[in-house]
Amino acid sequence: REKEWKRAIDAALALQMSGAGAYQKEIAQFHCEIAQDELVHVHADAALQTLDKALSYDRNNVRAMMLIGDALMAKGDAEAALQAWRRVEQQSVPHVALVAQRLMDGYRAVGRAREGVHLLKTYLSEAPSIDLLEVVFKAVLELDGTLSANQLVSDELRRTPTLLGLDKLIEARLMDAPPEGRAELSLIKSLVGSYAQKLARYRCNHCGFKAKQFYWQCPGCSQWESYAPRRSEELSVMNQG
C-alpha cells in the first residue's frame, strides 16, 4: 500500500509540474495514508516525519494534525498530543467534532478531565455538532451526574433544534425517569430514534453519497475532503438559518 501511495504522490507532482493543476490537497492526503499505515505498524517516529511532509503541502490538513496527535500519544507524550489535537480548531472549527473523543481521553489521561469538558463546551458553543455533544454529554454524565447531563442536552436542543438532538434528550431523560413513565419514554425514543438514524449521515458535497461514518475520501466518487464534519440534518438546519 505504501508503494501505491508513493506512486500516487509522484504522479500528482508530475501533473503539477506539467501545469495540469494544483494537487497539494491530494498529495497531503497521500502522505496521511502512508502515515496511518506507519502508525498501524507502530512506527510513530516515521509517521511524524511523513505527517510533517503532509503539512508542508497543505498546512490546513486536519487529518495530518489529528494523526500527529495520535503519533505523539503512541510515544507516550499526552501533553504534546493534546496540543496537536487542539490545533485542529485553528485549522477548521467544525472539524473539532472529529477530534473531540481524542481530546477528552487525553485530558482524562493527564488527570484534567474537567479542563477537557470546559474546552469541549467552548467548541460546542462555536460549532454545534451532535457528535461533539455526544462526547461532552458522556463526560458530564460521568463527572456531574444525570441532572447536569440533562441540562446540557436540553440547552443544546433549544439552541440547535434537530431530531438528532431530540433523540439525545430523550435518552438523557430516560436515565432518571420514574418507572411509571419509562415505558412511554422508551416508545417515543424508539420512534424518534428510527427517524433520527436516517438523518445521521455524512454527505459528500461532490456526488451526494451518504455514509454512516466520516470519510476523508468519498467511497462513491473518490473525491478527497468532500465530506463536511457534520451530519446531513445539521447541515440542513444551518442552511435554513
PLM regions: where:
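TPR-repeat structural position
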Residues: E2-W5, A44, A78, A113, ...
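Single-residue signature of alpha-solenoid repeat helices
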Residues: W5-A8, A47, A81, G116, ...
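Conserved structural position within tetratricopeptide repeats
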Residues: A14-M17, D52-S56, R87-Q90, L124-S125, ...
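Start-of-helix register in tetratricopeptide repeats
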Residues: A22-K25, Q29, A46-Q49, R63, ...
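Residue at a conserved register position within TPR or TPR-like alpha-solenoid repeats
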Residues: H31, E38, L72, Y107, ...
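Short coil turns that delineate tetratricopeptide repeat
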Residues: R59, V93-P94, A127-P128, T160-P161
